[in-house]
Amino acid sequence: LTLRGEGKVRFVGVSGVLPALHEQIDMGVFDVVQIPYSALQREHEDVITKASNAGIGIIVRGGVARGTPDDWEGRTYYMLPNEIMQNWWNSANLDDLLDGLSRIEFMLRFTLSHPGLDTTIVGTRSAEHLHDNITAAIRGPLPDNVVAEAKRRLTAAGATSA
């Protein structure tokens, strides 16, 4: 904070997870927070809202959960074994909500649907993947009714917000 006062630093941010994020937000010193969030990792949903309401910028990481069930073989995502994520996706019948979207587009647009989000970090493996991500982002958030239904199904499957 001394460096900010001296004009050497314009913005101060933190990348974090629960439970520390509540305290970090309450400190009132951060301009931006980077938080993991996706359809399959919703425990930070309320923290995003809290931080946004406090005027803190929100950067989401992991908004497509590092891929979709097809990509999860033998991987762990923020401490969640791939079997858990696959079970949530399948139990929630999220494929039924795709309506022509790819799973990646659905995940990205779900993430973009959170009203507190300012930006998201999305990885890419190829020029085609980058093009698909840009196209999905341009299409914007999912319709509210699709987000609500996805959340309802995911909650019933055990993937809940905090």
List the model feature ranges, each with a label.
Residues L1-A39, D46, I56, S113:
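Glycine/proline-rich, positively charged
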Residues M27-V32, E45-A162:
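Structured C-terminal cap/extension of enzyme domains
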